[in-house]
């Protein structure tokens, strides 16, 4: 009764109803309208696709085990298996049910990202890092099905040269091959940069001569993140983004001279001082409910470069590489 009621309510506003498949699992006694109704076929145990097609529904192929992303959850996928999807999957594959290619009742395919674990440190940038390559691959497969024109390895190489969209660079890519992509001999307080940020993978290094700094003193900021010389709470080196503050067990003392290096990728952020690792902020396992439950916590950073803060320390020899130099 619930599903049929809301289908008709939606249609009453002149809209086409789209529902998530559940009518095998929760069939009920009330007949449910199927004419001109689109159903997301996500789990065959909840909605058997052959039965749903027979009943008159139009399907969108979105099989959970194949195309669901749940970041750092430990179930479903953290990143889609694009090699498998490119080589083996088409919208005609709904879980273990396989239909004829271009079946008239299957409108196409989709993927989904579900952020089930609030508080796990995943940033908007991390979500985009998962979504964009999946979007590219699903676009190929929903347009071409089995008739892909390139081997995956060639496709994977060629797509790296394509921008996300005109004027869009959410991944923070600088340069197309591993290189030193930006440098400055000195960084003056309040100065601006050619680039707003650099995304994974990267290495940012600089020489510092320490001076007294107030808590909250920024080295760089962008619209998406802040890197602190002295964080607002403990005065340590660290960074903030998406409502999370992560700090390293290190601060520059007045008069101290040091070479600082920060490396970042899609799983970690590492601080080195004078060539020695201070901390590699990789994925943590956090426990709660008296230790009965746990959740992964990630501490990634798309490094901000847009504007320097109002610091007192001297910053020299800034170098930005678009790869991790230690790897």
Please report, for each region that a protein language model flagged, where it lies by residue.
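Flexible glycan-contacting loops in extracellular carbohydrate-active proteins
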Residues: 278-316
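Extracellular glycan-recognition modules
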Residues: 179-238, 315, 320-325
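Short, aromatic/His-centered strand-loop micro-motif at the edge of beta-sheets
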Residues: 237-259
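Active-site neighborhood of glycoside hydrolase catalytic domains
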Residues: 1-38, 42-56
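Substrate-binding cleft of secreted/luminal carbohydrate-active enzymes
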Residues: 63-70, 81-159
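Beta-strand-rich interaction surfaces with strong enrichment in secreted/lumenal proteins
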Residues: 191-195, 246-252, 290
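Carbohydrate-binding surfaces of carbohydrate-active enzymes
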Residues: 7-16, 22-23, 121, 133-200, ...
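Short tryptophan-centered beta-strand motifs in secreted/extracellular beta-sheet-rich domains
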Residues: 204-206, 256-273
């Amino acid at each position: 009764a619930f599903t049929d009621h809301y289908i008709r309510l939606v249609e009453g506003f002149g809209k086409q109803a789209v529902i998530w498949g559940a009518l095998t699992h929760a069939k009920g006694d009330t007949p449910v309208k199927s004419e001109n109704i689109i159903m997301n076929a996500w789990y065959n145990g909840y909605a058997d696709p052959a039965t749903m097609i027979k009943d008159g529904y139009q399907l969108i192929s979105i099989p959970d085990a194949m195309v669901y992303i749940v970041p750092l959850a430990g179930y479903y996928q953290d990143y889609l298996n694009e090699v498998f999807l490119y080589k083996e999957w088409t919208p005609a594959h709904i879980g273990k049910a396989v239909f004829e290619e271009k079946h008239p009742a299957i409108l196409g395919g989709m993927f989904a990202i579900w952020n089930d674990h609030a508080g796990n440190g995943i940033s908007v940038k991390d979500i985009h890092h998962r979504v964009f390559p999946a979007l590219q691959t699903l676009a190929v497969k929903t347009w071409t099905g089995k008739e892909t024109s390139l081997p995956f390895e060639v496709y994977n190489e060629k797509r790296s040269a394509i921008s996300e969209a005109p004027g869009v660079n959410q991944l923070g890519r600088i340069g197309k091959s591993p290189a030193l992509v930006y440098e400055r001999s000195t960084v003056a307080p309040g100065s601006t940069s050619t680039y707003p940020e650099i995304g994974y993978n990267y290495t940012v290094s600089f020489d510092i001569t320490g001076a007294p700094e107030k808590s909250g003193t920024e080295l760089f900021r962008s619209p998406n993140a802040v890197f602190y010389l002295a964080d607002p709470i403990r005065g340590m080196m660290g960074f903030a983004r998406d409502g999370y503050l992560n700090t390293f067990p290190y601060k520059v003392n007045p008069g101290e001279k040091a070479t600082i290096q920060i490396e970042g990728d899609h799983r970690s952020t590492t601080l080195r001082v004078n060539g020695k690792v201070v901390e590699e902020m990789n994925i943590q396992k956090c426990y709660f409910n008296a230790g009965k439950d746990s959740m992964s916590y990630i501490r990634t950073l798309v490094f901000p470069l847009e504007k320097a803060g109002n610091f007192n320390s001297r910053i020299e020899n800034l170098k930005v590489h678009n790869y991790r130099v230690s790897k």
